[in-house]
Amino acid sequence: MQNYKDLKVWEKAHQFTLEVYEVTKTFPKEEVYSLTNQLRRAASSIPANIAEGCGKSTQAEFARYLNVSLGSANEAEYFLILSKDLKYLNEMPFNKLFTLINEIKAMLISLIGKVRSS
C-alpha cells in the first residue's frame, strides 16, 4: 500500500489528536476516566486506523479502516459538542477543533470514494 505519513488526511488527523490532548488537560479531574479518555481515544483512533489501513494488502481492507476512522471522527465530533455544552471547552478552541474535525471527515469521505472506485 502507501506510506500513511504521506496522506494529508493522516497529517490533519494527527494534528487534531495533538490539539485534543492539549485542550483536555484543562478538563475537570473527575472526567479523566470518562469524557477526557473518550475524546482522546476517539481522536487518536482516526490517524491510527488510517495508518493501520495503509498497511493492509487490498484496497477493500484499506477502505474498511478508513470507514473506522470516519466513525471515530463522528464520535470525536460528538464529544467536542458535549464538552462545549458542559462548558469544558470555550468557544475558540471548540470552533477550531470543530472546523478541523469536519475537514477531516470530508477528506475521509473523499478518500473512501477514491479507494472504492480504484
Language-model segments: which ranges?
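Short, C-terminally biased terminal segments at protein or domain edges
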Residues: 1-118
